[in-house]
Structures are given as C-alpha cells and as structure tokens.
C-alpha cells in the first residue's frame, strides 16, 4: 500500500510539474505504436500530447531525414545540411520572417494545441537521443515550439505560391507597372440519397509527390480524450491534415484563388532606402540575413527588405517589389486542423472551419448523419473595389488604397450543403461547377477580385461524364471513377496554352512523322500503360510548354505542332529505334530497385506526373500519393 501511495504521489508530482511549467505529461510506457501489415502506425495513448509523441517517434522511424530538413528550414539552417542548394531556402525563410508572426500570436493560440505540439516535439527529441547517429547535424536539435510553428507558417505560404512568385521578382521577370520606372487533387462526396447502399461516401485523393517534404504519410491516432482519426499528414505534422473519424471525414484539394498580391514600390535615387506612399517617403526596413553554408567557414550575409505591404525583394534592375499574402499573417493553421480532427459532428466541424486560419484549400466533407458539404475556403481579404487596380497582376505600391487589412468571414465563400443532386466534386477546378448544373452557384454572386477558378479541367469534366448518367452510385462505381485513366472525349486545355493543333496536322504532308500523327488521331484518350497514343500525347505534354514558354494563354501553332512531332520522333528513334512504343515502356513506377509500367497522366483522375529517368524513360514523382475511400 505504501509503495502504491508513493507511486501515486510521484505521478501527481510529475503531473503538477508538467502543468505548472506548461509542459505536457508524457508517460512513454502508456504509449502504444502498433503497425498493421502495410506498416501504417496505429498510435494509442491516454492523452493527445502522448499520442503526438508516439506519432513523432513512429514517423521518425520511417523518415527522420525529411523531418529534420523541415526542422532546419524552420531555423533558417537548411544550408548547413544541403550546402549551397539550401541557401536560397534559408534566405526566403528569413525574408518572409514567419517567426515574427508566431511570436506575435503564440499566446493567443489554444493551450491544448501548444501542449499537443510540445508532445510531438518531445517525441522527436527522444528519438534523436535514442538514435544520435541519425541526427543530420548539430543545428537540428533542440527545437523550440516557436521554430516549429514558424515552419508551418512558411509551409502554408509556399503552398500559396511564394515559391513561384518570389523567383520571378529575384530574376527580374515579374510584370512591371507601366509608368513606374523608379506542382492537384480529387475529392468526391456522395449523399446517402444518391448511394446504392444508403450511406454517405467520400473520396480523399491527394495528388502530391510520392517522396519528400510534401509526401503523405498515413497514421491512425487515438487517445482516451476523444481523439480518434485515420488519415494523411506531411512529414513533421503532429496531427491529421485530412482523413476520417468514426463520425465524419473530410478531404482537401488545392484551390487557385488569388492568394498573393504583388506591389511595385516607388523609389528614386534622391531618396535612397525609402519608398513613396501617398506622397510620403517611408523608410524601407532592412534586415541582414546570415546564412551558414556547409563547407564555408563563415556566414554569408544577404539583405532582406520589408515595406508596409510585406516582405520585399530587389530585382537585378534595382526595382523593389513587395508581397502581401494572408498566409504570412496567421500562425493558427494547426489550431484549425486540430479542431477539425476533434470535431464529432457537422456543427463542430463547421465551427472549426469558421476559425479561418487556413489560407487556402477546398474542403469536402461527409458524415454518418446524412450531411455532405463543400467549401472553397481561404483567408481572403477585402480588396479595394476600384477597377483601376488589377489584383491578378502587379499593383501600385505607392498608395494605401491597395493595402488591405481585413478578411472575409466563412459565409462569403462558395459553399454547398446537401445538394439535391446528391453529390459534390472538386478536382482543383471551379467551385461553381461542383454539382448538377441546376444547383451550381453563380460566380456573379461572389467577389471577382478573389480570383476563383471558372473552368472545368479534364479530371472534373471526366468525373461529371461518369457521374451524371448514374441514378445511384455504388461503392464499386466510386472506385471505378477514382481510378479512371481516360481523358474526356474533348480534351480541355484549362491551364494556359491550347494544344489541339496536334490533332489537326495533315499526316500526308509529313511522311516521316505520319505514323505518329495517325496514332495520336486514332487514340481513344485512354492512358493505360499499353497505349501508344498515350505515349505520344504524354511526350507532347511535357515538350510543348518548353516551346511555348512566355506565350501562356496562346495556341500552339502548326509549326510548333510539327516541331513537337519531330521531337517525339527523334526521342523514340534515339532511345527505342521504333515508334510503336507503349506508355508503360517509357513511364515507370520506381521503388528502390524495382520498376513497373505506369499508366496515367497529369490531368486524368488517376493522376501521374513524371520526371526524366535514365535513358529515354520517365518515372512517377507525383500524382495519386494518398487515396482513402470512406463510407
């Protein structure tokens, strides 16, 4: 009895110490990590922070290197591991200054989230201590919660397009204002009224890289505090980003609203280090970023700038451009995801979504109580209605009229609940084409400055073609639709250049290229691995953007189409010495030393994106990275 009482006293003392220091109580002996036959970890523990500790340990067992690279990113120390290749990332991290956002907001975050994250970080620290030989370098640990949260803010900003916008500024290709001289996903929700079984169903289908920092990792998390969820997360994630609980499920897809505004500052030589706003010259804030690069004994310094609009970069011509994006203003993304993880019904889930901490993402939802729901969410600002400002291009950075400060609430986003059609879809296409035509929202009722997509892509068009004829949808139908490899009868070109000229070339005029032209014209639009037509189209898909660089929103010319056929001819003869090559011979799924024929293409429902591999082949590097069917 005395031993028991003594043990209880010690336990209570540990608990009190943990709580008084705002640290979670972690009892390693209470944490269970059980892996199924696929290696997926199922983690059980009394508390949420202890589950997060177990998740960190399990994920570190599988991919500790990737997790550590993210930690180094959050410290601006990636170059200490990657060398010069990591230096640009360290500079951008310093430029965006996400840690300042975290420091300003961390005290307003839910204390339960803070404990959860601390539990996760404790798991990583413990794994590192148990396996010191796996630690990349001395800069990885220890890691503070501020470092960690700064990484999450940075990651969301990258998802919002910083990685595409900033290089255009730094290399001088950003659009200049006249007069101022101074890598998709699918999701389908089916209502019980539309399903043959009378169940709600949801397809979660993320198109992400199959390796690296944004490759999905599956886990099942369950605590005695009510957290119970199976789904996917990225390396370094302390919770599920999308998945299913016993009561509800949701999926994310990337939406393409206007998430970043670019401002050209007004400067001149007479006011060095200043920029002009509303007739007033303001000081351009400067910070020196020190970058430590592996192999170089001293740090390299590079200047970062900031204006009232946001992080600012200097072009090679000496012009200054500022970026303003909501993703850099909110450190609460994990808090919203945590609330979504813990929701038990639609009311709680929608309350979580209404926090509006996520700067982007479509959210598709289904539950066991007959509700399906879709919203194209984001952190969208109220922008000036003056039509002289072109929000999808470069804005004048000489007036506060373009400086937005307030954000729209949930009810101003496109959303659907239980449409009569019985289904909702999103394939990174327009939120105004989400269900039956008669029930689709009218884009005229929403702010055009938000930049919502207004088009179908090939995946959404094909999904509609497969769903609309069905009076009811079975579970087998849902899987058949998801794994479909067919392009629609009329191929769409929604992302810029139009390439249907490839199908209009007269093969009789080009005898050498004639077999390729005929094969493409006779192609049934199926991208199975046995198809020769799919191979030709696939090679054209990756070659045409190179020919049309700088001519987006234009049409492929006849001369360019012929040049594309010539490229395909030369490629096949060089690498295979024949033209009747199948897609699967060239396109491969490679894991370790194994290589298999791979069907699919970037804009089919069973999406596959590839990169050059060896001599004359391409291997899958992105696409159907995570699939979950829920009913």
Q: Could you tell me what each predicted segment is?
A:
Residues 182, 223-224, 232-235, 243-248, ...:
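Glycine- and hydrophobic-rich flexible loops that cap the catalytic core of alpha/beta enzyme folds
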